Amino acid sequence: MDRTVNQVALENDEREAKNTWRLVFRIATLLLIVMTLAFSAAALAYSMEASTPGDLVGIPTAISRAEEKITSALGSNQDVVDRIYKQVALESPLALLNTESIIMNAITSLSYQINGAANNSGCGAPVHDPDYIGGIGKELIVDDASDVTSFYPSAFQEHLNFIPAPTTGSGCTRIPSFDMSATHYCYTHNVILSGCRDHSQSHQYLALGVLRTSATGRVFFSTLRSINLDDTQNRKSCSVSATPLGCDMLCSKVTETEEEDYNSVTPTSMVHGRLGFDGQYHEKDLDVTTLFGDWVANYPGVGGGSFIDSRVWFPIYGGLKPNSPSDTAQEGRYVIYKRYNDTCPDEQDYQIRMAKSSYKPRRFGGKRVQQAILSIKVSTSLGEDPVLTVPPNTVTLMGAEGRVLTVGTSHFLYQRGSSYFSPALLYPMTVNNKTATLHSPYTFNAFTRPGSVPCQASARCPNSCVTGVYTDPYPLVFHANHTLRGVFGTMLDDERARLNPVSAVFDNVSRSRITRVSSSSTKAAYTTSTCFKVVKTNKTYCLSIAEISNTLFGEFRIVPLLVEILKDDKV
């Protein structure tokens, strides 16, 4: 037992010895660490020359200075952020617009040089002011939420009148046609010396110009090139289009009345002309015997054409030769368009019979009056590669005056309401190579035209008529998916007579508040409208070129009516 006790005591002594050495080691280690820290602090103090407590007084000052430097640096960073925002949000878009302006200028100049090489001209190529770049031929109002009729026209604004007026009581200026591209606009009208009903001789005024902004910020149209085609040719029903080579114009050459032309057996002569950037005009007769071999009368649609895919597209209407291939292809075809919430009470069979008869009005000897579209390649050679598209009458109503428009990436054909359907029509149009396809139209029920009974403004049933007046709508309000919501236009707000011109914004059912030209008894006739935006101010304007009665100097005066499009946020 003693051995056991001794063994336990020995183990306890060994354990105490180990604990003692551990304690000694720990104390030595701590002393070594403290000494190391002391030497390090002394070395640091010596290196910083902060050997006295008084030297520590400068630390708060140093901290304050450091704080000021940090604040200044943060301020500089904010300046950088502000400059970046300004660059991204403001300067870069403007720079892009200026770049687009330069590009468009270069393209126009190049086009002019190509044209100038053919006519030995040395004049410069025109282009709109940079304020308008990106605001012409675009979807101007893209809005899915607002009521279309919350947009409305301002009062008419005073601006430079770029349209010549008659200078005698017997003078007549009629049938305006207008088109505007990203670089320039084109305008034309007919000039008759002895009253508006004379068909034997006339002049054709043709002008090329650009949009400018005055020093006070006002919009004005500046005519740069113009010509009055005063020769032995009697050009009628002319349509104009702004193309990269100038102002292309399509006219019929007329020597007889419209009724006589429809009763003839040969197509109407047509001419493709161009006013170049140098102010020189050239034209070429089309081979109508080949192009319009199935027609007895053929006319441009009066409204502007459109430059699409290297070709210029013009609206066409006229009479088909009975039993010709084109006439036979349309036999039995018809379409009936209905008024909004106002159904025709006639029996369906009777409606169909009247709809079919509407394409062959008695006024033109029972000839089928047909809609068509003509495309011509734009090159230094006039009248090159013309191609005629005749759409089926399962889509279009009786042929009538019209206009081809391009807004954004969408193309449209306006068709005058010469037949029974009074509301304005815009057919979506797609192009494939050299031909066009028309689709079911947008209709604007409140945008009507006056007409003779039974095809007056409120008419709702198919009938055979030749009536109405040319008043085209311009696509203004779009959905985000590019479908059309609303248009701007100047209509004649009367049931039967060509009276009371008013401007408004229209959706498919109703219209906005109106801007009236004058009293409800004011006589008027054709109107053609085009809208654009001043990108610099983000203001949208619409131009309505309207034939307004003028009792002192000629029967009509063509007036360019300018409005700004405003918005009523309460609607």
UniProtKB/Swiss-Prot annotation:
One GO CC term on file: viral envelope
Gene: HN
Main location per the UniProt record: virion
Protein's recorded name: Hemagglutinin-neuraminidase
Keywords carried by this UniProt record: Disulfide bond, Glycoprotein, Hemagglutinin, Host cell membrane, Host membrane, Host-virus interaction, Hydrolase, Membrane, Signal-anchor, Transmembrane, Transmembrane helix, Viral attachment to host cell, Viral envelope protein, Virion, Virus entry into host cell
GO molecular function: exo-alpha-sialidase activity; host cell surface receptor binding
Compartment annotation: Virion membrane; Host cell membrane
Regions of this protein lying in the Intravirion compartment: 1-26
